[in-house]
Amino acid sequence: VDCSEYPQPACTTERRPVCGSNNKTYSNKCNFCNAVVKSNGTLTVSHFGKC
């Protein structure tokens, strides 16, 4: 997932789940990428879809 355009102050409510390496489901790429930034890049995609 390319997170180069993040973090963003607000994400849409689009539902395209991403499962992170922390076993948490993020509602979409924007929310996932904002979490990646907060984790200093340690968070990765486990798979697309719910965890």
Swiss-Prot record:
Signal sequence segment: none
User: What keywords is this UniProt entry annotated with?
Assistant: Disulfide bond, Glycoprotein, Protease inhibitor, Repeat, Secreted, Serine protease inhibitor
Does Disulfide bond count among this protein's keywords?
yes
Question: InterPro entries given for it?
Answer: Bifunctional_prot_inhibitor (IPR051597), Kazal_dom (IPR002350), Kazal_dom_sf (IPR036058)
One GO molecular function term?
serine-type endopeptidase inhibitor activity
At which residues is glycosylation annotated?
N40
Site (Reactive bond 3) at T13, E14
Q: Name one GO cellular component term.
A: extracellular space
SUPFAM superfamilies reported for this sequence: Kazal-type serine protease inhibitors
Q: Where in the cell is it found?
A: Secreted
Q: Which cysteines are joined by disulfide bonds?
A: C3-C33, C11-C30, C19-C51
Kazal-like domain residues = 1-49
Q: Which Pfam families match?
A: Kazal_1
Notes concerning its domains = Avian ovomucoid consists of three homologous, tandem Kazal family inhibitory domains.
The name on file for this protein is Ovomucoid
